[in-house]
Amino acid sequence: WMKLAVHELRAAVAHVQADELSPCFKILARVKQVQRMLFEQWAVLETLTPSEYVQFRNVLGAASGFQSHQFRMIEFYFGNKDARSIGVFANHEVEYAELQRLLNAPSLYDEFLIYLARHGFDVPAESVNRDWSQPYTPQPGVIQVFKQIYDNPHEHWDAYEMCEKLVDVEEQFSLWRFRHVKTVERIIGFKTGTGGSSGVPF
């Protein structure tokens, strides 16, 4: 499912770069459904009790979600950038290069802001000319742009619909992360995660 999400997000970025928002609506609707599938998979893990989990915990060794380059790609497409997160892939040339490229490229949201700037919206320069490897910092001027779009949805329909689709996938991603935390909390409490993370606090 993550491979499909990566494929779709890559396509969405290409369409925004080409000033084609309408294909993104179907693409992001599909990404949302993929996210729902991933969300529901936690239900299986939630059936594990701590005592059941500890029976095979040692088999996992140091295996961790940290090792999923596709998940990291999804995070980068969504704008959750952290250069430290790709160090684990340093010995995997193809994956590392791909993640380096995404780390230093605009996220899907960044590309949308660039699109809005190209189409005459007064997007602050610091939102479209910045270090893409850093997480996005909210700007009051961007809020005003979105207010303009939402005050006149029929005049800016494609931009309006794109905003809604981005909110959809952001919401699903937040729900997935929350369920991840609650599942970890339920099964291992506040113990160290398999990859050496601080577990729930992480």
Predicted segments with their positions:
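Surface-exposed peri-terminal alpha-helical interaction modules
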Residues: 1-202
